[in-house]
Each structure stands twice: as C-alpha cells, then as structure tokens.
Regions:
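N-terminal, positively charged nucleic-acid-binding surface of large information/translation enzymes
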Residues: 1-181
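Structured secondary-structure scaffolds
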Residues: 1-28, 75, 80-84, 127, ...
Length: 327
C-alpha cells in the first residue's frame, strides 16, 4: 500500500501536466535485484528470474485496478538497465571516482559466506532501533556499513557473524559535496527534505560501497568475477532504463541521448518515500552528473504509512497489500 501511495501521487501530478498541455511521460520499474529477492526465491523454490516475473505481473494487475497511467512499467533486471549501469560505472571509473578498498565484512561461518546488507540484522548504530538491516535504518533513515550494526545476527543461520576482509569498490562520494550542494540549490525540494540533506552534507560524507560479494542477485561488475553492483547502484538507473525501453518500443531509441544528455531541456522529477531519500538525493544526482547525463530537476518525498504505530513494511510482514485494500 505504501508503494501505491507514491504511484498515486505521481499519477495525479502526471495527469495534471497532461491536462495542462505538457508532454509528460510516467516511467517506473520494479526493483528486481538484491538479497531479499534471492532469499525469497530460495524459500519458495523458484529462480529469482521467475519470482520477479510473477511479481511484475501482480504489480501491473494492481496498477490497472487503481487506474495508474504509467507510460512504461519496466524492471531493473533488464538488458537496458545492465547496459546503462555498466555505462555509468565505466564513466565514473574514467573520472577517477571508483576506488578499491579492503574492508572488514561480516562472515557467516556456518554458511561459509559473506553477509551482505539483508543477510544481517542488529541495532542501528545511529539511533539504536532494533531489527535493522545492514545497509540503512528504517527508523532514522541513516545509511551505514553492516559491520557497524550493534549486536549483529545472521539472518541465514541465526549465528553471530565473525569479521573477515574483502576487496570492495567505492564511489568517492566524499569528494563531491560541492556538486551535491550545487544540485540541491538548483532543484525543487521540499524544505524539510532540504534541511535533512544539508544536515547530512554538514556531517561526515562517506565514500559509498557499490559492490557486493557472491552470492548476490544482480548485475556482475565488468572486470570482476565475483562482484556485483549493489542494488542501489542500478535501481535508480532503472528510471533511465525504463525510458530507453519505452523509446525502443516506439522506435525512438535515437532520442535517448538527446533527452538524457547533461544539457537537455527535458525536466525530470521523482516521487519517492523518505526511506530512500539518501540514495536519490545524494548518490544518484552526482552519479548522473559525472556520467555527463541529465540530473533530476526535483524530488518529491513522502512520509511512511504506518500500521499499529510501526512503519508499514513488506519485508517485515507489517503491511496491507494494495490488492487487499482495493478489494
């Protein structure tokens, strides 16, 4: 139901733009990568590809019932997204913004594997909220490394993980504070959101770990055998991929570079929940800028739907489905 909220908000905005005479496309995609997808597929005994195919069919059926007017609803597990993710990664690498680092990472000795974000739970290192995953806190929206979790427990085995070294790739976000500030000053952002972003910018802006170790469901990083793009590297690129897919369907593929080049007059707006604000307003704009691609003109952020006083969350089983709600 939380996802339907932002789809409905966007739908209202898009319909207004169309009524006003503006040429407006409504583009979206299913986030199809990451540890939760892999775990769920393993649990029910099907491949991740089959799982995301089934989920997308259900989502499209639900959107039809709510009369959501997407021009294209794609998936991040697509040839277009793989192509664009590799393109952006290579551009960032060419700009000297990708760096290898040896990091300490949680390792499950029972399962003999490194534990990526959703394989581990513990207390948030910022606000002490219980039952938080290893990448970001659903309570305070902080992002962090899984090793920083307090009292970590492996989701897979229930054991206490040990610490081992692994080589990871980092996007040098710490060097790009001025670029983020410049984008923020020239974008349409709600004042409370702007204040939160300025708070983050005044703090310790850290380089961003964009790689994950095998096993992981996602795109392999070019040139690395057992490394995958972290889901939040390729997920927002899915907007561009959905547009490229739309253009291909309409035999307009050559328009992509004209629309998405850094000097394009096209306007781009996002509607998101506040839990993913960090990724959309700090990482994504400078990923695009340093790839010579158009940055968003604005980001509209909504708060959480709650159930029994807690954030509605599908991954935690605390939610009302959009299908049940409409029935």
């Amino acid at each position: 139901l939380g996802h339907i909220l932002e789809h409905t908000q966007t739908d209202i905005w898009v319909r207004f733009q169309r009524l006003y005479g503006n040429d407006c496309l409504y583009l979206c995609a299913d986030d199809a990568h990451g540890t939760p997808i892999m775990l769920k597929a393993e649990e029910i005994g099907i491949s991740p590809e089959k799982l995301i195919e089934n989920v997308q069919k259900d989502h499209i059926s639900t959107f039809d019932k709510y009369k959501i007017s997407h021009d294209n609803f794609h998936t991040t597990h697509s040839t277009e997204n793989k192509q664009l993710s590799e393109r952006i990664f290579n551009a960032l690498n060419d700009e000297g913004l990708i760096e290898k680092k040896i990091i300490n990472q949680l390792f499950d000795e029972d399962k003999q594997m490194f534990l990526s974000d959703r394989y581990v739970k513990g207390k948030c290192p910022k606000c002490d909220a219980d039952e938080q995953y290893g990448d970001n806190c659903e309570k305070c929206s902080a992002t962090y490394n899984a090793i920083d979790l307090k009292e970590p427990i492996s989701v897979l085995s229930g054991s206490i993980p040990v610490v081992k070294e692994s080589e990871h790739l980092f996007f040098k976000l710490s060097t790009l504070g001025d670029q983020i500030t410049d984008w923020l000053d020239n974008s349409r952002i709600q004042e409370p959101v702007r204040n939160k972003l300025n708070e983050w910018l005044k703090g310790d802006l850290k380089d961003w770990d964009i790689s994950r170790d095998n096993p992981y469901f996602g795109f392999k990083i070019p040139g690395y055998e057992n490394k995958y793009f972290y889901v939040w590297l390729d997920a927002p690129i899915g907007y561009l991929a959905s547009h490229l897919n739309y253009l291909k369907k309409n035999k307009l593929e050559s328009d992509f570079e004209k629309i998405w080049n850094k000097d394009s007059s096209t306007e781009v707006f996002h509607f998101i929940g506040k839990d993913i604000m960090y990724f959309h307003t700090l990482f994504f704009p400078v990923m695009l800028k340093n790839s010579a691609l158009k940055t968003p003109n604005g980001v509209f952020v909504h708060g959480f739907l709650t159930l029994n006083g807690e954030k509605m969350s599908k991954s935690r089983g605390n939610f009302i489905s959009a299908q049940n709600y409409i029935e």
